[in-house]
Amino acid sequence: MLGNKNISMAVIRRLPKYHRYLGDLLDRDIQRISSKELSDIIGFTASQIRQDLNNFGGFGQQGYGYNVEALHTEIGKILGLDRPYNAVLVGAGNLGQAIANYAGFRKAGFEIKALFDANPRMIGLKIREFEVLDSDTLEDFIKNNNIDIAVLCIPKNGAQEVINRVVKAGIKGVWNFAPLDLEVPKGVIVENVNLTESLFTLSYLMKEGK
């Protein structure tokens, strides 16, 4: 069920939102919810929610709705959140520091193990409990510390070179904030986060009054 590769990315991208809202419900000690009530909270139709969850077998009961804790746990498993991930962050500028300082990633099981930078002025800087390391040591650190994910917070110039290095060192997942579509071999997953594109979307929606 969890290995189904025919599920659309649109469905996959809705799952984190379900997970987040269900977590909020648990924080409010809400144990049961219907698809209609979930629809009112999230903004998707009840039919869409049922269709999305049915891709993974369905979790509701007729006349009962969803057990919030059970659904939250199962969606977490579908998203791969039932295991921890070790990450390195490349680029210790303002964006990199903001990400390194965000405690929510650790709470979710994503542990940043080290920060790297090529700028001599950044190397040795203390950020949280980390001392920024020279990016020349990046590959050795990845190989010796069971690193799963590389977070790239660097300019697009040089980003492809860095991705080539981390992939060669064994990285299988990249969270890319560089404004560049990176080329990677089969088996390596890249999730691009383009802040400018998101801002442009906001600009459009404001222009249209939506």
From Swiss-Prot:
Gene Ontology biological-process entries: negative regulation of DNA-templated transcription; response to redox state
Residues the UniProt record assigns to the DNA-binding region sit at: 17-56
SUPFAM superfamilies per UniProt? NAD(P)-binding Rossmann-fold domains, Winged helix' DNA-binding domain
Gene Ontology CC annotations of this record: cytoplasm
Q: SMART domains from the entry? A: CoA_binding
Q: Which Pfam families match?
A: CoA_binding, Put_DNA-bind_N
UniProt subcellular location: Cytoplasm
- UniProt cross-references to Gene3D superfamilies, sorted A to Z: NAD(P)-binding Rossmann-like Domain (3.40.50.720), Winged helix-like DNA-binding domain superfamily/Winged helix DNA-binding domain (1.10.10.10)
Q: What is its main location?
A: cytoplasm
InterPro entries cross-referenced by the UniProt entry: CoA-bd, NAD(P)-bd_dom_sf, Rex_DNA-bd_C_dom, Tscrpt_rep_Rex, WH-like_DNA-bd_sf, WH_DNA-bd_sf
**What keywords appear on the UniProt entry?**
Cytoplasm, DNA-binding, NAD, Repressor, Transcription, Transcription regulation
Q: Which family does it belong to?
A: Belongs to the transcriptional regulatory Rex family.
Name the job this protein performs.
Modulates transcription in response to changes in cellular NADH/NAD(+) redox state.
What is known about its subunit structure? Homodimer.
Q: What is the name attached to this protein's record?
A: Redox-sensing transcriptional repressor Rex
| Encoding gene (name) | rex
